[in-house]
Amino acid sequence: DEDINKSHFELPFRILKNDWAFIEEFLKNNLLLAKRKKMNSVFISSEDFETIFVDSFHAVQFENIALKLGYSVINWMCVLRNQWDYFNSLYAQLSSLKGTLNYSTAAHDVVHFGELSIGSGSNKWRFAFDYDFYIDRFLKNISGSLSTFSFESFINNGLVGMEIINIVIDCKDRERAF
């Protein structure tokens, strides 16, 4: 379906809007597709899941729907970047999108609150910087597992994301050839 694949932000956006009917349909279609192709995993990737990581009650709802549909387990994976590099990258990206963000104020929020929260009339983003706090809280809320990867290992294995791809693809003959 073109609508489902139109943006890397579509799924997180629908979760944040509590469009659980869309999420259920998306998960159902992908589970059926995986079964039809005799695959053992459905891999969903988006850099925009960070808000769901911070607001873990959304992750719980996502898991509940997936498990109800027949997914056997949910394995969450997260790439953690050096916080200073992450902050500067986010600031540059948001500035390029004409976000009105004061550098000093944003840095203050990161240092004192462990997160950066930005909202507009129709969107809201929350970015975690206090990794220990948010990981602990996420793990307390979810029923699945969480694996974390350093940004450096994520980009330095010949192909960006190779470390994660090798975990998700469980066919030893094909994982290096991907």
Regions found by a protein language model. Name each.
Residues 1-42, 46-48:
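PAPS-dependent sulfotransferase catalytic core
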Residues 16, 20, 55, 124:
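Flexible, glycine- and charge-enriched loops at secondary-structure boundaries
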Residues 48-50, 54, 63-177:
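PAPS-dependent sulfotransferase catalytic domain
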Residues 57-59:
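Aromatic-rich, lipid-facing transmembrane alpha helices and their immediate juxtamembrane interface loops
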